[in-house]
Swiss-Prot record:
Keywords: Disulfide bond, Protease inhibitor, Secreted, Serine protease inhibitor, Signal. This is Transglutaminase-activating metalloprotease inhibitor. It holds the Pfam family SSI. Belongs to the protease inhibitor I16 (SSI) family. It comes from Streptomyces mobaraensis.
């Protein structure tokens, strides 16, 4: 009986020792952290606004939308696909997009509207502001990007 009790105690000690040893080994070498997922595309996410006034800082924002162009066009912009296509065609050059088309006839009234774009375009930080003299000029120069 004494041998049986001793054998059980020895077996228990060996099992307990192996469990503690395995626990010590597991805690000594932590599991490797999962690799951060890298995007295949440079981010393109913008907030676009239209406001009445001559400067964005003092203009009353009338409308604002979000525009995401990667990996697919989305956001609250009513024509996200068209706006993203126009930005890609202009290589993200907002000055090209807001250029008033030649041959446009508008009055010379001063009723300024300002458009802004802020965010990231193809991985590059963007902060753009353009003031149109009046709604006629804005309609002639805003393109799809600021049409909302």
């Amino acid at each position: 009986m004494r041998y049986i009790t001793g054998g059980i105690a020895l077996g228990s000690a060996l099992i307990l020792g192996s469990l503690v040893g395995a626990g010590a080994t597991a805690s000594a070498t932590p599991a490797p952290a999962p690799a951060a997922q890298q995007s295949l595309y440079a981010p393109s996410a913008l907030v676009l606004t239209v406001g009445q006034g001559d400067k964005a800082a003092s203009a009353g924002v009338q409308r604002a939308v979000t525009l995401n162009c990667m990996p697919k066009p989305s956001g609250t912009h009513p024509d996200a696909r068209g706006a993203c296509d126009q930005l890609r065609a202009a290589s993200g050059n907002f000055a090209e997009i807001t250029k008033i088309k030649s041959g446009t006839a508008c009055t010379k009234e001063w009723n300024p509207f300002v458009v802004t774009a802020e965010g990231v375009w193809e991985g590059q930080r963007v902060k753009y502001e353009h003031t149109f003299a009046n709604p006629c000029e804005m309609k002639a120069g805003k393109g799809t990007v600021f049409e909302f």
